[in-house]
Amino acid sequence: MLPKKKLHMKVGILDSTLREGEQTPGVVFTTDQRVEIAKALSDIGVQMIEAGHPAVSPDIYEGIRRIIKLKREGVIKSEIVAHSRAVKRDIEVGAEIEADRIAIFYGISDTHLKAKHHTTRDEALRSIAETVSYAKSHGVKVRFTAEDATRADYQYLLEVIKTVRDAGADRVSIADTVGVLYPSRTRELFKDLTSRFPDIEFDIHAHNDLGMAVANVLAAAEGGATIIHTTLNGLGERVGIAPLQVVAAALKYHFGIEVVDLKKLSEVASLVEKYSGIALPPNFPITGDYAFVHKAGVHVAGVLNDPKTYEFLPPETFGRSRDYVIDKYTGKHAVKDRFDRLGVKLTDSEIDQVLAKIKSNPNVRFYRDVDLLELAESVTGRILKPRPPENIMALISVKCDSNVYTTSVTRRIVLIEGVREVMEISGDYDILVKVEAKDSTELNQIIESIRAVKGVKSTLTSLILKKM
């Protein structure tokens, strides 16, 4: 095994789900959702939260204001960053809202200077210096983002960094705005910048246009970057930026450091998936449904003997669990293990017969536990009773009386022990309740408690068979 690498600097995360992430086409967060996401990011230990651009719209302003209020009350621990153009009014809004830091961005490549800013290099330097100084005069910390830095003239980039340092910025974000960096170049870039400007700390903001965002932020950290920009689920303009869950896992594996609470990554990723409306593909690293699911018979046999054969870290590291698929690729080890889990004892001959039936139906995508039991019963001629499930999770659909205010029912259901999440929904039912129970007896008690709530007309319970 290759030895773990060591970073020379301490590295932290700036998560930009609320700013960069909301720039994903079709994504809009409500004010309440912004606050909930910010609290979740703080809870997992994100060092900085880029809460948005307060001058863009009243709802973003209000969301950032509420997030900052929670910071002042000690509920949120992360540093709160407000995004800003190099415009005095934007800076005034960021200062007025009392953000911990104002992040001023300005495109510094010749393409940006000409096509977007309609200015010259010298005029841009004067404008940048003026706005950074103006922000600093308001008593806030200042980060300057060199937008499109990786396509800018390098000597001009150095001039820009010197200018913003002299004007009072203590951090500079190097933005690979169109995702054209590659890792070895990234490492060299940050090594050079950190050696030239030891009094400045550098961020890396890497877009994923060529699929190298995660590799580039790791290389930047090796080169001396102290803050890595991420979004949950890799949201952002076009194809997004480095995903928080993948960056955190890579830092753990390659450098042995935990920048956030890894066990809570799936939970916050699901929260953003729900609020953004952007579903993760099942094969997404770390938090995708298939991230720790094995299929090929040789793979499953190896994992059953020693999970390290096909897992770089245990899924429990990330609050996940491993599983495997039963289909035509399955071997005897997997079939035997699945029946052992169900508490059903079969002879070797019976397992071989079940496996033969599985392989004789090559177009079946996967076999559920109930399907396997039916196959086993057809082989053995016996009625098989699986072990009663433990640690049951279920979804309970609730229909309310027509003359009842649904929210009043929801508020009572939330208070029932064992209820984990309550959602008001459209369709034949009014409320969806996610519950967790240690056994079937406790589940029945929860169901009866829900049915006893005034205004509940009927319920329908569905057991959660598998959680990826």
From Swiss-Prot:
One of its GO terms (biological process) is lysine biosynthetic process via aminoadipic acid. NCBIfam families: LysS_fung_arch, PRK00915.1-2. Residues 11-266 form the Pyruvate carboxyltransferase domain. Disruption phenotype: Cells lacking this gene do not grow in MM without or even with lysine, but grow in MM with the simultaneous supplementation of lysine and arginine to the medium. Furthermore, the mutant strain does not grow on MM supplemented with lysine and glutamate, but grows with lysine and ornithine. Pfam families: AsnC_trans_reg (PF01037), HCS_D2 (PF22617), HMGL-like (PF00682). This is Homocitrate synthase. Catalyzes the aldol-type condensation of 2-oxoglutarate with acetyl-CoA to yield homocitrate. Carries out the first step of the alpha-aminoadipate (AAA) lysine biosynthesis pathway. Does not display 2-isopropylmalate synthase and citramalate synthase activities since it cannot use 2-oxoisovalerate or pyruvate as substrate. InterPro entries: 2-IPM_HCS-like, AIPM/Hcit_synth_CS, Aldolase_TIM, Dimeric_a/b-barrel, Homocitrate_synth, LeuA/HCS_post-cat, PYR_CT, Tscrpt_reg_AsnC/Lrp_C. The keyword Calcium does not apply. The keyword Metal-binding applies. Belongs to the alpha-IPM synthase/homocitrate synthase family. Homocitrate synthase LYS20/LYS21 subfamily. Inhibited by lysine. The active site is at H299.
